[in-house]
Amino acid sequence: MDFEKDLRAVETNIPGLIVFDLPVHGDNRGWFKENWQRAKQTALGLPDFGPVQNNISFNAKKGVTRGIHAEPWDKYISIAAGSVFGAWVDLRPGDSFGQVYTTVLDPSVYGQINVYGVTTKSERH
């Protein structure tokens, strides 16, 4: 696991989709990470938002497919253990329509993804 790195925001090819690379602090007891730190993350471009809902899911077996639904609010995604292959497609009309972003998320590499200001297909009707 990559310990003691700096917090950084990574822009993607989809406007409004930001990956936060989180510092993970470790020692002989295990590891600790700040999953959310408002002042630090808003300074790096995360809009100041109020979460609407907080969910946790657990997959008992490898290879489970889950989808993130297209609710019309910001999403802040965090991985607690293991890894996840994530894929995002921009369905908004405009220059970025059809752009795809994929990455493997885990607690130590790209631990957070913020999807903000992304209009869902259902909102266009």
Residue ranges, per PLM feature:
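Non-catalytic, conserved peripheral segments adjacent to functional cores
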Residues: M1-Y110
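Conserved metal-binding segment of the jelly-roll/cupin
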Residues: T103-H125
